[in-house]
Amino acid sequence: RQNRHEASCRIVSPPVCGNELLEKGEECDCGSPRNCRDPCCDAATCKLHSWVECESGECCDQCRFIKAGNVCRPQRSECDIAESCTGQSAQCPTDDFHKNGQPCLSNYGYCYNGNCPIMHHQCYALFGSGAIVAQDGCFKFNDRGDKFFYCRKENVIITPCAQEDVKCGRLFCHTKKSECDFDYSEDPDYGMVDHGTKCADGKVCNSNRQCVDVTTAY
């Protein structure tokens, strides 16, 4: 047996134009004509004006498509490509970037998914502006395969770095504290060299933390 409250919840009210609720049959509802602040909406009918091309989006302004050529997503690095409005859509085109493996930052790195990952920037992110990449000798710790130094860690299985892959494991930085400073957490990827980072001339770290030829890495 239903109580009154359950029964009342099933009553469907007819749509009311002007109550600021988008209901069945309405394209918009911006309140009364006096209070409406939506230039795209005809407050009297709760329909969009006939000239409206769009209501929202990176390439929509005052209910019309922004002219073609206006940048809607700026270039975030030299590996990225700026996107511009097409004049035919309210949405910014799909994010695009230069080909993975293209040299960047004066050949200190290679493009990877729109960024140019290099160890120096990763040291800066971990330890601040005074940090630089440590000497090559520090990275040799990564062949130990212990709690801190490894190439892969999956559950309890720790895989040490092969000698040729040591620069794809734990990131080592030269700081005021130590010449071989590093950071770690319970997250097995924290403090590790980022995927796509240059590990030798013509080579980058792949997703398995192997230092492989840049032409086959992606």
Swiss-Prot record:
Glycosylated. Its EC number is 3.4.24.-. Disulfide bonds join 28-46, 30-41, 40-63, 54-60, 59-85, 72-92, 79-111, 104-116, 123-173, 151-161. SMART domains: ACR, DISIN. It is found in: Secreted. Ca(2+) binds at residues 16, 21, 23, 26, 29. Keywords: Calcium, Cell adhesion impairing toxin, Disulfide bond, Glycoprotein, Hemostasis impairing toxin, Hydrolase, Metal-binding, Platelet aggregation inhibiting toxin, Secreted, Toxin. Expressed by the venom gland. InterPro entries: ADAM_Cys-rich, Disintegrin_CS, Disintegrin_dom, Disintegrin_dom_sf. The keyword Chloroplast does not apply. One of its GO terms (cellular component) is extracellular region. Residues 14-100 form the Disintegrin domain. Belongs to the venom metalloproteinase (M12B) family. P-III subfamily. P-IIIa sub-subfamily. The hemorrhagic metalloproteinase-disintegrin-like bothrojarin-1 is a potent inhibitor of collagen-induced platelet aggregation by blockage of alpha-2/beta-1 (ITGA2/ITGB1) integrin. It does not present any fibrinogen-clotting activity. Monomer. This is Zinc metalloproteinase-disintegrin-like bothrojarin-2. The lineage of its organism: Eukaryota, Metazoa, Chordata, Craniata, Vertebrata.
